[in-house]
């Protein structure tokens, strides 16, 4: 088997040539990791052994004080001028310096990056035929020629140089101005070349190499700790990051263990067992203040045939939602705020209804701490408003057919189309305008009339959460990524923050026991009622298939049989949000509220034109590439023709209402959704 490795030919061109080879670095990091793991285990063991054993996640909480000092940074300490920030479209602000109890300092800038779907293809060859997946063959004409950095809308995966130069551009221009990176997966080529089928080992190798590139690019080279990064990185698992694509079994498995090894420098050590089970974790982006949860969306994904739903207690999606619930409650108890992230967006097109509805409930009932969510997979820049109140209604109706809920309510034609898309994995866009028009009709238009009735502070805005879906690096359209700006003004007023909570390793130790206990009790209860439930379901299935009317009657009967408070006994459903909790950062401008964003893109057609011109002028390949390749501002959230005051939920709901009724605005929105590539169906 051909061993995959980062190509040597053009490494020096990226500005990252000072890195050691991936294999040497891997051995070095493994040795260091073993030492660090041993020391961490020793320290953790002493803490646990001296602590009282807990019977639940919140009883007899152990005190663990961690102190942080916050101070503003003077203008002469700023790493970049206001003029430079303005040229990048960013808002100058006053960074905040955090000093922990050990004296370690970190500067908080109030910005972060969302990047997704790079799909680097090490078999990509410049000047080959696009029709032959950019792997081989002589181009039939200039339109069939594989460009060095890729061709928008042509269907090939990303050239390695596109990934290298993208990260290098971010490193040179933005790495000193962001606090963390949300990286939502798909780091491996598609399985779209029958002559070079993907293998499991190749997928592991590619995930490792891309992870190492992120580590090298954003490492804190002033620190002696190999785990220290200039910015924190929160990766998520993509449906093409596994073998075979889309298929991901309940953990622990070889894949979850191998992925933990690959991402061990991104994942807090206390969460290793959690990752082994769910391939999910979270990171404190700002210690004690702001967290980012990485969800393994493959356990909820319709395209994964190894999982079914989030209703059956044996399903990994159900178990992962238990983890989500306990984790969110702990973050709320600690007074923290949180972003969610994952690869596949949690919408009905992608998720089983029991999964998308339940996740919508958590977004809604924990809206005092959840700011929103970032996802990839779709390759298009757009947003989906998720209605939490509607999710409660959908769940109540679907429970009538127990674990068959959602199955018979699905649009079978839509599922057939989705299945066809899954089989034909690739980068070429197909019927994307049709999809976006569906988003407009299904989401934006349906809320338009309600929005017109709302007052400035109407609580109905709080029924919605926003799912942000990012542009990809792979040239499905033009490559793009986004920088978000968020509120840090209140950090400047806090002299000290004292946290008294159980250590995270203690929390997760007891959480594992708690979840296992819940699962065992639920499975025992199901076994007792299994025979009766099977008879009930068997009698309902023919009615459902014959008539929707009969199905609804069947649902009504089953619902009457159950307690009206059935959701209170199932911990994958959240408790109602206490009425005394104020609106969170997604709804009112406060600490960590998202204020605006800047969308960057690479105009591949113009880059290739400039690159070829420079070659003709006598420049070397590396010189021409360094000059030609660049990202530029595509637009900012406050740009015309639909400038947003902020990027709170209210602003998105009002934008959705505007887009539903204004075709001219919609045309601009579509142009931006397709990253200024000129795409049309």
Swiss-Prot record:
Superkingdom of origin organism: Eukaryota
Pfam families on file: Metallophos
GO cellular component: fungal-type vacuole; vacuolar membrane
Alphabetized InterPro entries for the sequence: ASMase/PPN1_MPP, Calcineurin-like_PHP_ApaH, EndopolyPtase_N1, Metallo-depent_PP-like
Entry-listed glycosylation sites: 127, 173, 309, 487
Names of the cofactor(s): a divalent metal cation
Protein name, per record: Endopolyphosphatase
